[in-house]
Amino acid sequence: MSAGPITLKPLEDSQEAAWDAYVLANPRATFFHRAPWRRVIERAFGHRAHFLLAEQGGRVLGVLPMFHVKSLLFGSALVSTAYGVYGGPVADNAEVLALFHERAEAMARELGVDHVEFRAAEGERPGWKRKEGLYATFRREIGPDNEKNLLAIPRKQRAVVRQSLEKGLVGRVDDDIDLNYDMYALSVRNHGTPVFARSFFHALKKEFGQDCEILNIHKDAEAVAGCLTFYFRDEILPYYAGGTPRAREFGAHDFMYWDLIRRGADRGCRVF
């Protein structure tokens, strides 16, 4: 008996659990394919979400998260996933993948966008352009033994970590998003980069809960660095980080990334 036709339809609130269950189970999916991104980006930036769910006989066969991003600087585009480092369609087979590409191209024509951008490592569409050398991915494996994890850090950075421990730096996981945001905003502004709205950080924490962690680094009572980090399966994803002018004095950034590795290993993570 046939399972019926494959259908592509917009994601509804009632289907979010099924969407995320598929994302967690598919090894090609990433944190940036998760369903809550549609609310985060729509509320924080106003970009309309177009999340497509592929089904056959009630079974999820694939997902494609997209946003219609309108910008005076970059024009109009369908992006998967906006404000994320990964995205694009994730599907069980080539047939579903082709349907996603066809629907994205049709939506691009309907919306009149300048281009479609899939931030995907695989699943290229014939005829689409691939941008080489634009992005870089940094990943390393970590193990359950934190002494070995420390020894795996390059010698110079490892020395800074040990010195920061001697200086009394302490990492604290808490819900002080505003403190974390202030350090991020200060660092980004000092580099001449536009600063995201505070509401974006609050939306991330609200939507992703325990999978979005706030780590602030303190020297005594003073916060000197911080990082907003995502957790996905066995992976740690440090995403937005910053520090005060005194961070370098204490080696706070090196300590912060070591503390993230240590905490992630204790949590069962194996990729940093």
Task: List the model feature ranges, each with a label.
Residues 50-52, 62, 87, 102:
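N-terminal, well-ordered alpha-helical segments
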